Amino acid sequence: MQRIYLLSDATGETVERVVRAALTQFKNVDVKLHRMSRLRTREDISLALDEAAKQPGVIFYTLVDNVLAQYLHNEANLRELEAIDLITPLLFKLASLLGIPPQKEPGLLYQLNTEYYKRMEAVDFTVKQDDGQEPRNLYKADIVLVGVSRTSKTPLSMYLAHKGYKVANVPIVLGIEPPKELYQVEKIRVVGLIIDAKRLVDIRSARLRNMRQSPRGSYADYQRVEEELDYCRKLYRKHPDWQVIDVTNKSVEESAAEILKRYDEGFPD
């Protein structure tokens, strides 16, 4: 059995992924990986190398501090251990190419990966909660958007999801009570969307034309739209702790900024 030691100043996930990716090119090999993470002082490195020397094998390491990287290299040589630096040559090449020095902050890639997976999880949740789907999961949402049809619930939901927020949206339909689960959501998380009636008629009419349908039905009828919005306003008045956003002539980005301002005030870091 061959031993491979993975040394890192952060979690060690980066060096392990690189080595595992390389190992996929070799079939039926007996290899044991030993990960040693958060090595941020000379003492940490010396202790790790002493441990590796007990059962020698090759060492792969990622240390963004080139002083510590050089120390590891020298100490490994003293112990007659083979150590391969996976990150310093890359950092030097990129620094030369970009004309700026690296930040030398351990764990940046891990932080980026964590943020990426958080966003993907939020997007997946938001897609599944679109248009009132799975109301039993409303309590899991960071933000719940409510409003009549064509008030930008879905575009807003997806925009916020890509910022890492789990968003659900619930349609408000004239004469139909929203799902009971909506009233169980923490009030500060609920955002009611409202819009000018004439603007909503224009949006719905354009939608119908794009679908090659007549805009003369009740969906884009001004009187019907007024009734829907009045029903919506009455619902919002019953729940004064809900945030209400007027999305008339606002971009998704502008509406999202208003929502997040209230959200951040209610849930400060």
UniProtKB/Swiss-Prot annotation:
Keyword tags: Kinase, Nucleotide-binding, Serine/threonine-protein kinase, Transferase
EC number: 2.7.11.32, 2.7.4.27
Presence of the UniProt keyword Kinase in the record: yes
Enzyme class, spelled out: transferase
Membrane-spanning ranges: none
Domain of life: Bacteria
Amino acids binding ADP: G147, V148, S149, R150, T151, S152, K153, T154
Molecular function terms, GO-annotated: ADP binding; ATP binding; phosphotransferase activity, phosphate group as acceptor; protein serine/threonine kinase activity
Catalytic activity: N(tele)-phospho-L-histidyl/L-threonyl-[pyruvate, phosphate dikinase] + ADP = N(tele)-phospho-L-histidyl/O-phospho-L-threonyl-[pyruvate, phosphate dikinase] + AMP + H(+); N(tele)-phospho-L-histidyl/O-phospho-L-threonyl-[pyruvate, phosphate dikinase] + phosphate + H(+) = N(tele)-phospho-L-histidyl/L-threonyl-[pyruvate, phosphate dikinase] + diphosphate
Function: Bifunctional serine/threonine kinase and phosphorylase involved in the regulation of the pyruvate, phosphate dikinase (PPDK) by catalyzing its phosphorylation/dephosphorylation.
Similarity comment text for this entry: Belongs to the pyruvate, phosphate/water dikinase regulatory protein family. PDRP subfamily.
NCBIfam families: PRK05339.1
Listed name of the protein: Putative pyruvate, phosphate dikinase regulatory protein
Source species of the chain: Geotalea uraniireducens (strain Rf4) (Geobacter uraniireducens)
Lineage of producing organism: Bacteria, Pseudomonadati, Thermodesulfobacteriota, Desulfuromonadia, Geobacterales
